[in-house]
Amino acid sequence: GKWMWWSRGIGGKSALDYLIKVRGMDFVEAVQTIMGNGSASYPTYENSNSYEQQPLLLPERSPTSDVVVEYLFGRGIDYEIINECLDKELIIESLPYHNVVFIGYDENKEPKYAAYRATNQSRIMGDCTGSKKQYSFRLTAENTGEVHLFECAIDLLSYATLLKLDGKDWRQFNLVSLSGVYSPKQKIEDSKVPVTLSRLLEKDKTIRRIVLHLD
């Protein structure tokens, strides 16, 4: 909420402002503190799992995307957004089970992350072998000054749909999936900053605002 340091004549509208202006933290340190429930100690970075050191193994691709389109549209995702993600190969349909696969790329446009999700009634989902979470699924825009974080790709696409329904251009928003639920531990020193977020802040120094869309 809002705060004011009367003796210094400075104030702000968020905890992020307070930690930077009053506690003297830099932006990344302030974000780490907030993500860890506000403790002054800093969490460690999330280390990659051993399977992430392997090359990314993408599933066989279906020649059509009919099942994936029907599934995502049934989840309320806008048809235009679905098609654009398909055109950019951010989403593919796999064989033999016709799962939806969400793909993340590195700076060279090489696929480095992939998460699959069943398109039927089952709850089968997970990361493909070799997935590197720092390149998680995202819809990016440059020089926005902010980033919106989501637990999963479906949540991200749902928000993009809501932006469009609200008359906003969803392509002008920086939307990033954390590729899983983030839950800081009671002891902040045992918590880990999501590697997706830490890499994002290292690479894009223009980001000054982080919007959390977490369950």
Label for each model-derived stretch:
Residues 95, 139-144, 203-206:
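Flexible, charged surface loops at secondary-structure boundaries
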